[in-house]
């Protein structure tokens, strides 16, 4: 008997794609194909794993005008493309983690009476998911409290899936020889970088290094050269644009300084990493602040708005944390309590239930 076919619609950022890949890895009984957008991250991560179909698409601007008309035309074309794909290749259902591609995929599935299942990682669901949820068979949630933001939908708290490497015993940091007794700070600004965070950390770094602390600073592609040129060489200050082996890095970290994207927070929770969160101030509906607040309430993190934070305040806060191992231990324990390590399996179970019934 041939395997049932499942179309995964996930595009754009790692926050959409990595959870979808984790769920796909749990669904070996399905024949999976992927629907995305040209020139986005899925074009690097998906080929070689699953067949990838792409269709041009951009977000709808709030204000009507030429760009809005073009985006609306693309959305309708993407809907027709998705509908033809689902029909001609006899897919049994659609799974989406949100983003622009979710709308045409879910609406196409509904028009063919096929089940659509979604997953929302953020505490405050995105507008696309909030609008589409009523037409989904079920919506998996990364945070239980997210159900209050979604009306007319069947929801289930499943946690946010993380990459499989976060669920195995981490290997040693072969490329970063941090002494066992040395505190390690990991700084993460996102894939494109966070200039404000990078600048504040650069100001604080000399004092931290004098105290014997190690720093792994992930600048993002757009900020690497500026940070590298403005920072003196020091064996305990390692600067990279990206770092692929995040599971062992975060497992070794004593403290993370980070934005508050949902996928990153899930990785911090699974690894039990205390964090100082600086939400991206221009995120849609300030949803990163809502994410960060959930970890603060659980005792797993501290939160500062970018506008309110300065290098001296960052320095004092980090020193207070690293000088108090008991506080860090409590934060780490709180993070692990909030984590859902088997979120990928739980979400895959939800997909199975919806597609088969």
Curated annotation (Swiss-Prot):
One of its GO terms (biological process) is regulation of cell shape. It is an enzyme of class 2 (transferase). It is a peripheral membrane protein. Pathway: Cell wall biogenesis; peptidoglycan biosynthesis. UDP-N-acetyl-alpha-D-glucosamine binds at residues 13-15, 122, 163, 191, 288. The keyword Glycosyltransferase applies. It catalyses: di-trans,octa-cis-undecaprenyl diphospho-N-acetyl-alpha-D-muramoyl-L-alanyl-D-glutamyl-meso-2,6-diaminopimeloyl-D-alanyl-D-alanine + UDP-N-acetyl-alpha-D-glucosamine = di-trans,octa-cis-undecaprenyl diphospho-[N-acetyl-alpha-D-glucosaminyl-(1->4)]-N-acetyl-alpha-D-muramoyl-L-alanyl-D-glutamyl-meso-2,6-diaminopimeloyl-D-alanyl-D-alanine + UDP + H(+). It holds the Pfam family Glyco_transf_28. Its main location: membrane. It comes from the Bacteria. Belongs to the glycosyltransferase 28 family. MurG subfamily. Cell wall formation. Catalyzes the transfer of a GlcNAc subunit on undecaprenyl-pyrophosphoryl-MurNAc-pentapeptide (lipid intermediate I) to form undecaprenyl-pyrophosphoryl-MurNAc-(pentapeptide)GlcNAc (lipid intermediate II). This is UDP-N-acetylglucosamine--N-acetylmuramyl-(pentapeptide) pyrophosphoryl-undecaprenol N-acetylglucosamine transferase. It comes from Gloeobacter violaceus (strain ATCC 29082 / PCC 7421). The lineage of its organism: Bacteria, Bacillati, Cyanobacteriota, Cyanophyceae, Gloeobacterales. The gene is murG.
